[in-house]
Swiss-Prot record:
Proposed to be monomeric or homodimeric in nucleotide-free form and to oligomerize upon binding to ATP to form two stacked hexameric or heptameric rings with a central pore through which ESCRT-III substrates are translocated in an ATP-dependent manner. Interacts with CHMP1A, CHMP1B, CHMP2A, CHMP2B, CHMP3, CHMP4A, CHMP4B, CHMP4C and CHMP6. Interacts with VPS4B; the interaction suggests a heteromeric assembly with VPS4B. Interacts with SPAST. Interacts with IST1. Interacts with ZFYVE19/ANCHR; leading to retain it at midbody. Residues 75-106 are annotated as: Disordered. Keywords: Acetylation, ATP-binding, Cell cycle, Cell division, Coiled coil, Cytoplasm, Cytoskeleton, Endosome, Hydrolase, Membrane, Nucleotide-binding, Phosphoprotein, Protein transport, Transport. One of its GO terms (biological process) is mitotic metaphase chromosome alignment. It comes from Mus musculus (Mouse). This is Vacuolar protein sorting-associated protein 4A. The keyword Nucleotide-binding applies.
Length: 437
């Protein structure tokens, strides 16, 4: 924002006052709240003298007080048929007697958060996750066992309530969370990001955090998965905004605060930069599991998983050679290599100048073999017909299978995305605070 922030706040308050006098209370409330945000920004970045700051702060309190009265009035309008609220008169104690379930604001926030509930299971099983056996066992211990054998977790033996998955990008942290959502059949799975919990309205973000945890407690057993948790819970410092500080405080209170019973609720966080997490947040993640770059055996399994049922002629020796050549690559990097190699046959079809007739399965009925399919070939090949892919009928193309040379070509053009410096930082964090997976 520029130096016109204070003027913008004054303009908004002027409009809010006009709407207030015209008894358009909903619009007035919105404008008051918006104006307060601009005033707060002006206090922080534009007002240089203490006297100016104090003057703006006093005005802020006045408009906030009016906004609260309007909010209470609107909340109780339908139920109690209240008369328009006077500027210097409070609403009385009608709102105190409201039950939580009848609170329309709370209901609206909870409906907004219900969009974070994963209703359809992702269909990713533990077997689909290559390697990471330690992380899988820890998640089974925290999620699956308490649901299946609740009698095991009584007395002092309680399941973990906070698990942090950290490691370089592309190592499978979010993929593991999808596997948890699939395998935890009876759990409600909330998948939230910073955008689900951030609001431009003053005070609404922390209410969203509080309501998220209340929803999770209502639907337990439940799992709250927060991807890129560092964007919400970074270290507290004097340069951060007041809103960010309040969100962090609410997270701390809800995860392990007085009066909050989180039995049956697991908070699962994932981050690539764990060293920026606030120390109090880090403590609340009782298990901190390092998700490293995949080892050779896991990389070989990844190549097999990503190739799937696509036609190829790679042998086990080829797969192990590829695994050896991809030291330092993440699971996401390997996925990109395989996807690119699967496109190589398509590129051969596009660039081919000659095709030849071959025998292969029919497109309409794979059990029937036909001998008039066309596949790309070199110009010197016996039976080569000069034509381009545009001349090939749609149901007569037999694409080449993926071969080792396709894989090596894709590998040569794909570099690992994990930076050596970041890897050292993650390993240092793991040595200080983590646990090997």
């Amino acid at each position: 924002m520029t130096t016109s922030t204070l003027q913008k706040a004054i303009d908004l308050v002027t409009k809010a006052t006009e709407e207030d006098k015209a008894k358009n209370y909903e619009e007035a409330l919105r404008l008051y709240q918006h104006a307060v945000e601009y005033f707060l920004h002006a206090i922080k970045y534009e007002a240089h003298s203490d006297k100016a700051k104090e003057s703006i702060r006093a005005k802020c309190m006045q408009y906030l007080d009016r906004a609260e009265k309007l909010k209470d009035y609107l909340r109780n309008k339908e139920k109690h048929g209240k008369k328009p609220v006077k500027e210097n008169q409070s609403e009385g104690k009608g709102s105190d007697s409201d039950s939580e379930g009848d609170n329309p604001e709370k209901k609206k926030l909870q409906e907004q958060l219900m969009g974070a509930v994963v209703m359809e299971k992702p269909n990713i099983r533990w077997n689909d996750v290559a390697g990471l056996e330690g992380a899988k066992e820890a998640l089974k211990e925290a999620v699956i066992l308490p649901i299946k054998f609740p009698h095991l977790f009584t007395g002092k033996r309680t399941p973990w309530r906070g698990i942090l998955l950290f490691g370089p990008p592309g190592t499978g942290k979010s993929y593991l969370a999808k596997a948890v959502a699939t395998e935890a059949n009876n759990s409600t799975f909330f998948s939230v990001s910073s955008s689900d919990l951030m609001s431009k309205w003053l005070g609404e973000s922390e209410k969203l955090v509080k309501n998220l945890f209340e929803l999770a407690r209502q639907h337990k057993p439940s799992i709250i998965f927060i991807d890129e948790v560092d964007s919400l819970c970074g270290s507290r410092n004097e340069n951060e905004s007041e809103a960010a500080r309040r969100i962090k405080t609410e997270f701390l209170v809800q995860m392990q605060g007085v009066g909050n019973n989180n039995d049956g609720t697991l908070v699962l966080g994932a981050t690539n930069i764990p060293w920026v997490l606030d120390s109090a947040i880090r403590r609340r993640f009782e298990k901190r599991i390092y998700i490293p770059l995949p080892e050779e055996a896991a990389r070989a399994q990844m190549f097999r998983l990503h190739l799937g049922s696509t036609p190829h002629n790679l042998t086990d020796a080829n797969i192990h050679e590829l695994a050896r050549k991809t030291e330092g690559y993440s699971g996401a990097d390997i996925s990109i290599i395989v996807r690119d190699s699967l496109m190589q046959p398509v590129r051969k079809v596009q660039s081919a100048t000659h095709f030849k007739k071959v025998c292969g399965p029919s497109r309409t009925n794979p059990s029937v073999m036909i001998d008039d399919l066309l596949t790309p070939c070199s110009p010197g090949d016996p039976g080569a017909i000069e034509m381009t892919w545009m001349d090939v009928p749609g149901d007569k193309l037999l694409e080449p299978v993926v071969c080792m040379s396709d894989m090596l070509r894709s590998l040569a053009t794909t570099r690992p995305t994990v930076n050596a410096d970041d890897l050292l930082k993650v390993k240092k964090f793991s040595e200080d605070f983590g646990q090997e997976s």
